[in-house]
Amino acid sequence: MLYVLPSDKADFRMRIFNTDGSEAEMCGNGIRCFARYLHDFGLTEKEEFTVETGAGILVPRLQIEAGKVTGVRVDMGEPVLEGEKIPVTGFGMNRVIEEDIEVKGKTYKMTCVSMGNPHCVIFVEDAEAFPIYELGASFESHPAFPRKTNTEFVEVRDRQHVRMRVWERGAAVTLACGTGSCATGVAGVLTGRTDRKVEVELDGGKLTVEWDEATNHVFMTGPAELVFTGEIAD
């Protein structure tokens, strides 16, 4: 659930709550939906504006054709790569790239990134076949992650295309994760698997992620579609 709130630091403030009631710092898919909501319901006439989140101030830009929002490009800011800032236990200020993590008796290679929230990226041979339902919770609550973690299981198709499935902290398996897609794009570059611009295929659709070398900012572009409207009773 997303809340639209006033901000003294940005044009708007966004708060996010997971299905288990916990509050998240950021949601990449959420901020695209948030941006479209502001436009469609007349809360802003701007095509680009600032949003205060738990991960800092982010800048969505609406892509509009014939008066309709066709997509949203979001400047997601700089990725955080230092272990203790993500946080991941035992790495201090070092980066966590292709480091061992043992889950249920098997060792995997993890690359960890924060996009305002923690992510553990695991590259796998076959994303469809990976037992995400059996192992996802064990990654999320692993002792290496003091604030738990989101975990992305990623199959590299080529240097511009990856297939990603995600176990989200506080929400389990979801159809897509915007910050997870950004973390995946960064991890692909850090491990030499992908280019700086990559298409991420998720269960719920596709996102384009670009880690800009000049600014060190990550840009995410994707759709935001109206599914339904409703009212919550008092």
PLM regions: where:
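Membrane helix-loop-helix hairpins that form the core translocation module of multi-pass transporters
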Residues: 71-73, 77-79
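A glycine-rich beta-to-alpha transition motif near the start of alpha/beta enzyme domains, typified by
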Residues: 1-68, 120-234
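Short, surface-exposed loop motifs enriched in S/T, G, D/E and P with embedded aromatic residues
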Residues: 60-61, 107-112
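Short acidic-hydrophobic surface loop/beta-edge motif
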Residues: 49-51, 96-103, 113, 198-200
